[in-house]
């Protein structure tokens, strides 16, 4: 969740006004998801939050690296204010992790067998009738070769 802006915090850099409506929309959708948490397991309830977090980070990543629409100063400010996940973006820049859905899917310490999540396995290596759904974030497959 982004930090609150008060009178004591630094003003956002130039260009923030152009992307602020989209970031506010992401923030409103996050609040809506948090308020409508229903029944189900913990991971099923957290999956929409992980997906929206991924979308917001991907939006900022695309603005800076793909479209080059924002300045370095604004990009660093957005990361510092927690509008995007800097660690996830750092992984997206590495080969093989371009489509990574969340950091939990590559952490081997949190899995039963000490391996990565099933969503990281390429679909060509799985059976055709096998349905892949991540237990952490609800991803349907984020291997870079898919």
Curated annotation (Swiss-Prot):
It is found in: Nucleus. Keywords: mRNA processing, mRNA splicing, Nucleus. GO terms for biological process: mRNA cis splicing, via spliceosome; mRNA splicing, via spliceosome. GO terms for cellular component: post-mRNA release spliceosomal complex; Prp19 complex; spliceosomal complex; U2-type spliceosomal complex. The keyword Protease does not apply. It comes from the Eukaryota. The keyword Nucleus applies. InterPro entries: BUD31 (IPR001748). Belongs to the BUD31 (G10) family. Belongs to the 40S cdc5-associated complex (or cwf complex), a spliceosome sub-complex reminiscent of a late-stage spliceosome composed of the U2, U5 and U6 snRNAs and at least brr2, cdc5, cwf2/prp3, cwf3/syf1, cwf4/syf3, cwf5/ecm2, spp42/cwf6, cwf7/spf27, cwf8, cwf9, cwf10, cwf11, cwf12, prp45/cwf13, cwf14, cwf15, cwf16, cwf17, cwf18, cwf19, cwf20, cwf21, cwf22, cwf23, cwf24, cwf25, cwf26, cyp7/cwf27, cwf28, cwf29/ist3, lea1, msl1, prp5/cwf1, prp10, prp12/sap130, prp17, prp22, sap61, sap62, sap114, sap145, slu7, smb1, smd1, smd3, smf1, smg1 and syf2. Involved in mRNA splicing where it associates with cdc5 and the other cwf proteins as part of the spliceosome. This is Pre-mRNA-splicing factor cwf14. It comes from Schizosaccharomyces pombe (strain 972 / ATCC 24843).
């Amino acid at each position: 969740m982004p930090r609150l802006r008060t009178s004591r915090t630094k003003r956002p850099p130039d260009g923030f006004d152009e992307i602020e409506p989209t970031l506010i929309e992401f923030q409103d959708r996050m609040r809506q998801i948090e308020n409508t948490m229903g029944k189900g397991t913990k991971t099923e309830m957290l999956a929409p939050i992980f997906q929206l977090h991924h979308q917001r980070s991907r939006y900022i990543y695309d603005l800076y690296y793909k479209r080059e629409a924002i300045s370095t100063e604004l990009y660093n400010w957005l990361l510092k204010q927690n509008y995007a996940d800097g660690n996830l973006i750092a992984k997206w820049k590495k080969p093989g992790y371009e489509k990574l859905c969340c950091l939990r899917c590559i952490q081997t310490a949190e899995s039963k067998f000490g391996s990565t999540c099933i969503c990281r396995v390429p679909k060509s290596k799985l059976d055709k009738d096998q349905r892949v759904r991540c237990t952490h974030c609800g991803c349907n497959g984020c291997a870079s070769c898919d």
